[in-house]
Regions:
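Short, Lys/Arg-rich flexible segments
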Residues: 1-145
C-alpha cells in the first residue's frame, strides 16, 4: 500500500532539498528556462492574435491584412517577427541569465517606435503579464519568499 500523509511529505522534502543542494545551478537554470519560455510564448501569442487597426489589401500574395493599432502588439503579416523570437539561458560566473530575443531587424522599431511610427510593444507587455507567474515559479523553487 502507498505511503501517505506526513511520510510522503517528508520524502518529498528530502528529494527536493537534495535536488536543490546537490545542484543549485541546474535547478536555478531550469526555473529561469521555464520563465523565459513563458514570456517567449506570450510575446508570440500577442503578435499572432491579430490587429484591430485598419484593414487593407495586400497584393503579393493577394489578401487582406489588418494592421495593429497604436500601443497594441504588432499584427503578424508574414510570420517573420514571430519566427525570430527565441529564448535562451546562459550561465555566467555569478548569475544565470535568461534572454528573450527578437532577431528581426525591425523588432526594436516595433517595440519602441520611431519618429514616424508609434510603439507597438510585444516583449515588455509579455514580461509584465507573466511577472506574477514568474514570481510564483521562483517562490515555489525556494529562491524568493
Amino acid at each position: 500500500m502507498a505511503k501517505s500523509g506526513i511520510q510522503n511529505l517528508k520524502g518529498f522534502q528530502k528529494k527536493l532539498k537534495k535536488r536543490i543542494v546537490d545542484n543549485p545551478e541546474k535547478h536555478l537554470h531550469s526555473l529561469v528556462q521555464r520563465s523565459t519560455t513563458l514570456v517567449e510564448g506570450t510575446a508570440k501569442q500577442s503578435i499572432l492574435k491579430g490587429g484591430t487597426g485598419i484593414t487593407y489589401q495586400k497584393y503579393n500574395p493577394r489578401r487582406q491584412h489588418t494592421a495593429s493599432a497604436e500601443g497594441e502588439p504588432p499584427a503578424s503579416d508574414t510570420g517573420f517577427l514571430v519566427n525570430s523570437i527565441s529564448s535562451n539561458v546562459k550561465r555566467t560566473k555569478n548569475a544565470v541569465v535568461g534572454q528573450i530575443i527578437a532577431s528581426a531587424p525591425y523588432a526594436s522599431h516595433l517595440e519602441f517606435g520611431t519618429r514616424d511610427i508609434r510603439p507597438r510593444p510585444f516583449m515588455q507587455p509579455a514580461l509584465e503579464k507573466n511577472r506574477p507567474q514568474i514570481k510564483r515559479i521562483f517562490k515555489k523553487g525556494g529562491y524568493i519568499d
